[in-house]
Curated annotation (Swiss-Prot):
CDD domains to which the protein is assigned, alphabetical: GT_MraY (cd06852)
Name of this protein: Phospho-N-acetylmuramoyl-pentapeptide-transferase
Name of the top EC class for this enzyme: transferase
Pathway(s) served: Cell wall biogenesis; peptidoglycan biosynthesis
Biological processes per GO annotation: cell division; cell wall organization; peptidoglycan biosynthetic process; regulation of cell shape
Intracellular or extracellular location(s): Cell membrane
InterPro entries xrefs: Glycosyl_transferase_4, PNAcMuramoyl-5peptid_Trfase, PNAcMuramoyl-5peptid_Trfase_CS
Provenance organism: Staphylococcus epidermidis (strain ATCC 35984 / DSM 28319 / BCRC 17069 / CCUG 31568 / BM 3577 / RP62A)
Disulfide bonds: none
Keyword Thylakoid (UniProt): no
Family membership noted in the UniProt record: Belongs to the glycosyltransferase 4 family. MraY subfamily.
Keyword Cell wall biogenesis/degradation attributed: yes
Length: 321
């Protein structure tokens, strides 16, 4: 059945994307590009965005099929809720952006509040309604030590889900970058899930991988479509949720290492400019720094993928030992 889920997820996305692209073009749902960004990006202006809808639809349909046939499918139900919740936030954000024809969508406060609501509902569904059981201890790899957080774990969940949903969003600035890194990350968690005896989560990870593989050919340079916030916010929320449900939260720092570095580069850039009026990087997130330093877009993407693969394998090894 796993093979069937994979094929269904792959085919749905692969078929939907070429249908959605001309529809988005007719509706003029094109991406606006930052004027201060690399000049090579200006030609991307008008490229259809909100393409994340395709793999989210694929994930939803395939997950519902899996829920019907998989024993102990509660983890898939929860992951599906997070997918829809964060995806809806991204969809609303994208819709506002393309209607206004600028790069401003939901305000930071609106987006943050909506993400917090989804994270809290996730905890309530998990803990109060017992859809799944996970410990409220923060597991520290290698030292066989857990930090009991008790109620503070709710705060951690909010921080983790909101943080990583925005981290993937920040990384989605080059053709294929976030998509490829997500495929790598979900592959690591698929293996980890089976090794930690969580097959339902493993099945969901496989659905994620193949849904994204159906999207990747259209998202590679030169991209025919962008996933938009619709896709990136959902992907980040899913990553955080999987790490929480496996009680391997800190593994995400390595499995999602590039996402972490991209986010830190933005935070450091903002802090440095506010404190010293000087910038650390030529532009943030850091992938733009390398572009402005003379790297081609494809080189940046492949190097970042390679880093993501190496750190992902390390994160996987730590997670299962």
């Amino acid at each position: 059945m796993i093979f069937i889920y994979a094929i269904i997820a792959l085919l749905i996305t692969f078929i939907l994307v070429p249908i959605l692209i001309p529809t988005l073009k007719r509706m003029k749902f094109g991406q606006s590009i930052r004027e201060e960004g690399p000049q090579s990006h200006m030609k991307k202006t008008g490229t259809p965005t909100m393409g994340g809808l395709t793999f989210l639809i694929s994930i939803i349909i395939t997950s519902i099929i899996a829920i019907i046939f998989v024993d102990h499918s509660n983890p898939i139900i929860l992951l599906l809720f997070v997918t829809i919740g964060f995806g809806l936030i991204g969809f609303i954000d994208d819709y506002i952006i393309v209607v206004k024809k600028n790069n401003q969508g939901l305000t930071s406060k609106q987006k943050f509040l909506a993400q917090i609501i989804i994270a809290v509902i996730f905890f309530v569904l998990s803990d109060v309604f017992h859809l799944v059981h996970f410990t409220t201890d923060l597991h520290i790899p290698f030292v066989n030590f857990d930090i009991p957080l008790s109620f503070a774990y709710v705060i951690f969940i909010v921080f983790w889900q909101v943080g990583f949903s925005n981290a993937v969003n920040l990384t989605d600035g080059l053709d294929g970058l976030a998509t490829g890194l997500s495929i790598i990350g979900f592959a690591m968690y698929a293996v980890m899930s089976y090794m930690l005896d969580s097959p339902a989560i493993g099945i969901f990870c496989i659905i994620m991988i193949f849904a994204l593989l159906g999207f990747l050919p259209y998202n590679l340079n030169p991209a025919k479509v962008f996933m938009g916030d619709t896709g990136s916010l959902a992907l980040g929320g899913i990553f955080a949720t999987i790490s929480i449900m496996l009680n391997q939260e800190l593994s995400l720092i390595l499995i999602g290492f590039v996402f972490v570095v991209e986010t830190l580069s933005v935070m450091l850039q903002v802090a440095s400019y506010k404190l010293t009026k000087k910038r650390i990087f030529k532009m943030s997130p850091i992938h733009h720094h390398f572009e402005l330093s003379g790297w081609g877009e494809w080189k940046v993407v492949t190097v970042f993928w390679t880093v993501g693969l190496i750190t992902g394998l390390i994160g996987l090894w730590i997670g299962v030992h």
